[in-house]
């Protein structure tokens, strides 16, 4: 299916995004990362065999002070992604939405069968992908993506892909920029992948309002099905933390006072508990 070029759904401008993301970079770690070298390493090829593009996710929002004890707990059961001696990687994500912020509102209103569209750039390898995440009515996350040239993206390919997956032609615009640094672990015994995201920073596309979250980190447990034994989940729950429906896109929009086409602030009632939790975690020492 080909998209009418007179009405492109999504115009990608990686160079512009990169300039904005570079201003968001934060590297002021207050934690010791030397523990990462104590994990058994795995390669990107090995990790791709457990890509879990169709999966069940559990997300946990945690204070930075439990990062080191958590990692110590995971040493026995998990390996760590290692690329040329590097174990922590820089991500730049640009999110797109309709002018009315329909993707945001679908999530806010608890709608299933909902989408998120983003351009993700892996800074350390200079690889880019257009990605579409779909949360179905069984609460499974299905992610599809295509590689994208970060210098001269193929606009026709982008629009064909997005149109085919979304099933409509409403134009999308840049909504939010997100930076973070990621560690990826694989369970040695079960089909489970864990991502640990640190040093999150956000900027709204229209208002250029920034929010930096350096005192928290996000753990996401990704499995084919539930429940597999997970020492990661057990440790987190043992310490009194519960899973939360945390979306970087939605929370980033709420933190940066994102607006719709009429410059009306987006409603965020559904996210107040998470926003309050963020405030609480940011005051812990």
What residue ranges belong to the model's regions?
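Phosphate-end processing signature that detects enzymes handling 5′-triphosphorylated RNA
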Residues: 1-285
């Amino acid at each position: 299916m080909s998209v009418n070029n007179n009405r492109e759904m999504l115009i990608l401008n990686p160079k512009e995004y990169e300039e904005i993301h570079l201003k968001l970079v934060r590297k002021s770690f207050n934690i010791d990362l030397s523990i990462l070298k104590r994990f058994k390493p795995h390669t990107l090829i090995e990790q791709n065999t457990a890509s879990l593009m169709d999966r069940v996710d559990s997300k946990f929002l945690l204070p930075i002070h439990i990062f080191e004890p958590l990692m110590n707990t995971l040493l026995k059961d998990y390996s760590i992604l290692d690329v040329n001696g590097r174990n922590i990687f820089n991500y730049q994500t640009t999110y797109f939405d309709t002018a009315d912020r329909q993707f945001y509102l679908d999530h806010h209103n608890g709608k299933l069968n909902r989408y998120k569209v983003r351009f993700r750039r892996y800074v350390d390898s200079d690889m880019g992908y257009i990605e579409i995440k779909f949360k179905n009515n069984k609460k499974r996350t299905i992610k599809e993506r295509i590689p994208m040239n970060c210098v001269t993206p193929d606009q026709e390919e982008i629009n064909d892909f997005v149109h085919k997956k979304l099933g409509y032609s409403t134009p999308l615009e840049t909504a939010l920029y997100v930076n973070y640094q990621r560690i990826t672990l694989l369970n040695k015994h079960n089909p489970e992948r864990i991502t640990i995201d640190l040093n999150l920073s956000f900027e709204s596309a229209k208002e250029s309002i920034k929010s930096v979250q350096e005192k928290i980190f996000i753990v996401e447990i990704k499995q084919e099905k539930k429940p597999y034994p997970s020492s990661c989940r057990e440790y987190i729950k043992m310490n009194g933390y519960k899973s939360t429906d945390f979306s970087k896109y939605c929370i980033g929009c709420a933190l940066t006072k994102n607006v719709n086409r009429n410059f009306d602030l987006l409603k965020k009632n559904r996210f107040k508990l998470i926003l309050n939790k963020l405030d609480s975690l940011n005051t812990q020492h």
